[in-house]
A protein has these predicted regions:
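Acidic, metal/ion-coordinating pockets
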Residues: 1-156
Length: 156
């Protein structure tokens, strides 16, 4: 299985590069699943709803995020409807959107889990405890589990 993960796509130059390169990279490397962190796609902070379709049309399968996901208020209603745009799973209960998804990629089912670290970040639930809770659930549905850990410290 060939996996492509990239982040953070930053602003218009990052969006343009991804739109230009991802289709070719998918063909050239026979990529089965492409996960793209988009939390800084709107001018370096946040993401706007129309960008979701741009990324998916360019070949991204799942969009992940981090602490800037809700910087643009317009994303709140979009993230509640779009299950391929993830926010960190360790955000408090009741936060719009989901922190994980499963999907078919070639012959496999793939789970993608989005977590956020706590060092040098705003207070949030423990990502490791949240992973311990969610990974077994994903493992019941998916043979492959990818984790996007958005963090400031490599120790996390």
């Amino acid at each position: 299985m060939n996996i492509f993960m990239v982040g953070d796509v930053f602003g218009e130059p990052g969006r343009a590069a991804l739109k230009k390169l991802l289709p070719r990279l998918r063909r050239q490397h026979e990529i089965d699943v492409a996960v793209v962190n988009v939390e800084n796609a709107a001018g370096g902070s946040g993401v706007m709803p129309p960008m979701i379709r741009e990324f998916l049309d360019a070949g991204a399968d799942v969009l992940t995020s981090g602490n800037h996901i809700f910087k643009k208020k317009e994303i709140i209603s979009a993230i509640a409807k779009e299950n391929l745009l993830l926010r960190p799973a360790n955000y408090p209960p009741g936060t719009p959107g989901s922190g994980y998804v499963t999907m078919k990629a070639g012959p496999y089912r793939v789970g993608v889990l989005n977590l956020m670290g706590r060092i040098f970040m705003e207070p949030i639930d423990c990502p490791f405890r949240k992973a311990d809770e969610i990974v077994p659930e994903l493992a019941r549905e998916a043979r492959v589990i990818l984790v996007d850990m958005h963090a400031e410290a490599t120790s996390e």
